[in-house]
Structure formats: structure tokens, C-alpha cells
UniProtKB/Swiss-Prot annotation:
Localization in the cell: Secreted
Keywords: Amidation, Disulfide bond, Secreted, Signal, Toxin
Tissue-specific expression: Expressed by the venom duct.
Chief location category: secreted
Stretch forming the signal peptide: 1-22
Residues the record lists as Tryptophan amide modifications: W63
Family: Belongs to the conotoxin T superfamily.
Free-text comment on this protein's domains from its UniProt entry: The cysteine framework is V (CC-CC).
Changes after translation: Contains 2 disulfide bonds that can be either 'C1-C3, C2-C4' or 'C1-C4, C2-C3', since these disulfide connectivities have been observed for conotoxins with cysteine framework V (for examples, see AC P0DQQ7 and AC P81755).
Name listed for the protein in its UniProt record: Conotoxin Pu5.1
Origin organism lineage: Eukaryota, Metazoa, Spiralia, Lophotrochozoa, Mollusca
């Protein structure tokens, strides 16, 4: 029962704090779309390299081996 007043006070303090962004957005911030495009490009490059070196996925690729 001693924890209830503390819990109520904490809730009141949390509710009364102003909502402020933790990190302001700088003008030179890179949008996430460019990171997504870069990731897709890298994955496509790795996929093409993996398929060209391993004609049969079960022969030489470690990620293609099946148990």
C-alpha cells in the first residue's frame, strides 16, 4: 500500500512534463529512403555475386547447404 502514493505521484509528474523531441532534426539529416535504397543495392549486388560463383546452391555456397 505504501507504493500506491509514489506511483500516483510519478504518473502525475510524467503527465505534466512538456513533450519535446529528444534530438532536434538537423538540416543536413539524410532521409531514410536513401539508406533503404543503399541497402537494397548492396543486397542485390551480394545476391548476384553469390549466384554467379555458385551455379548449384548446394555445391559451394555455405548458406545454400541443406541438411
Amino acid at each position: 500500500m505504501r507504493c500506491v502514493p509514489v506511483f500516483v505521484i510519478l504518473l502525475l509528474l510524467i503527465a505534466s512534463t512538456p513533450s519535446v523531441d529528444a534530438r532536434p532534426n538537423p538540416k543536413d539529416d539524410v532521409p531514410l529512403a536513401s539508406f533503404h535504397e543503399d541497402a537494397n543495392g548492396i543486397l542485390q549486388m551480394l545476391w548476384k555475386k553469390g549466384r554467379s560463383c555458385c551455379p548449384s546452391p548446394t555445391s559451394c555456397c555455405p548458406w545454400g547447404k541443406r541438411k
